[in-house]
Structures are given as structure tokens and as C-alpha cells.
Amino acid sequence: RDARLNLIDLWMEKPDNVAEMKVGLEARSVETSKFKGWEDKIAIAGTYWPPQFVLMDGDTLKPKKIVATRGMTVDNEYHPEPRVAAIVASHQKPEFLVNAKETGKIWMVDYTDLTNLKLKQLDAAKFLHDGGFDSTRRYFLTAANSSDKIAVVDTKESKMAAVIPVGKIPHPG
């Protein structure tokens, strides 16, 4: 939770730290690229403070792009400090999915060109939390705890498949 990432070389005689990066003051999520041909080439970390995510070189953790998550909620209200909750790497496309907690937006981050970064935001439900993939690795399911909903993203089509009311405080694990 201290927003410090460590890259450890497990192939060394004695595994050791080979790179370190501090991406903020407090963080919850880190992920690496999973799409075929891009495996572990890009790393991403999302922070609670400052409200941002950082894209890094997967071999060195050298920062390549920092993106602030400040913006509008799904209710069209400005939120100055939306924290980054879950981050997952798509298996369908070279993209990360980033939950901006308080805004209720799921960012789809295309990492093929970090200089000209392509971002798409999907409206889900406020207070996004944790999530994961279904068994096909096509659908990302994520809980919106305080909204009592589960959002489902079709990562093959890059669109919201459903936002499902589920009762009280869904929590994936």
C-alpha cells in the first residue's frame, strides 16, 4: 500500500530486486500486459493518492506515461480525487481496464502507442472496487460496492455488456 513496486529477478542464483519505482503515496493495484506478443512488456500501477495511474516499461519499471483520473462521475458531477481500484489486463486486446472508484468509470487503456495514448471510458456505477475475469477471459466483472451493482465489460467488443443490480454490497473476494 506504500505505492512502491519492486521487480525481482527470480532467475538469479539468489533472487534479488533489480528495479524499484514509487508511483505515489498510496496504491492498491499493479498489473502487467497479457495480450499475446505483449506479455509483461508494459506494467501499470494505480494509486489512491495522487489520483492517477502510471504506465511503465515492464523490464525496468521506468515510467512512460502518467494519467490523472480526475473527472466527471457517471452522474455528471466533477470529482477531484477518484482513486484507482482494480486494474486488469485484457487477454482479448492490448489494453488495461482501470477502475476509477468514485467516478464509476472503467478506463480502457490501449498500450500499443504510449506516446499517443488511446483512452476510452465506460460508464459503470459509482464506487467501483475489485473484480476479475470470467472463465473465458472475455468478460471483466467488477463490483460497485456502494451502488449494489456488478458491472460487466465485454473486452472483445470494448463495451459495457451489463450493469446488474445484485442486492447488498457485492464483493468479489
Residue ranges and their predicted role:
Residues 1-173:
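Predominantly soluble domains enriched in secretory-pathway, periplasmic, or organellar proteins
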